[in-house]
Amino acid sequence: MEMDQSLLSDAGRVRSDVHVARRAGTKKAGFAAAIRVIVIGMIALNVHWTFTLAIIAIFTMTLGNLGALVQRSVPRILAYSSIAQAGYIMIGLALAPYSDQALTGSLFHIMNHAVMKSAAFIAAAAVATALAGYSLERYRGLGRRMPITAIAFSISLLALAGVPPLNGFWSKLVLFGAGINTGETVWWGPYLAIAAVLNSALSLGYYAWIMRKMYMEEGSDMSRVKEPRSMIAVLVFAMVFKIGRAHV
């Protein structure tokens, strides 16, 4: 009876995660519209609080990445990762009054992040559906037990980390480049870019940790598991987008 209740609870959380993933694109579209309104308002009102926003961006990136490093649940890791990604997007807000490239980078990263994070949550939901759990321990040997899910999840994680040539690399490159290029206008632009690069490197720690579980460790049960077909179809589409987007 307790086992049945546990499985029902897990199934409920899986449905919640899929719902979150489906809504990610809509939320990112709203975020993009908000960015446009804020930037236009800042320029129109001649508000010079961009340095404060840059500090908040650094704090947000660092807080999200450090928080993710100490989690033991994959959805929690992804949630803290989203905080860090919001910090990267804020770089564009801080630099937008000085660089069109910065605003372009933010909007580009919002679009990429919607795909990357949705795919990551769907992969986590697929694992939870098949293995009835969210703990990192469930991911031991996943590369052999659920190979398609593991590959799609790995590509999502690498894209979130900004590893070339995936789509996350290119939007981060635009953002970080904006920081470097505004050095003659605002002294802190290059330092903001450096902080972002260091945080991207830090994020590799927990992304690689998950991938190590999937490919370099073995669980007590290494038998193949049936992968949810509906989720696999979405993951494959997202995987193609993340790779193909790098060449656009």
Residue spans for each PLM region:
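Hydrophobic transmembrane alpha-helices and their helix-loop junctions in integral membrane proteins
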Residues: 1-173, 177-203
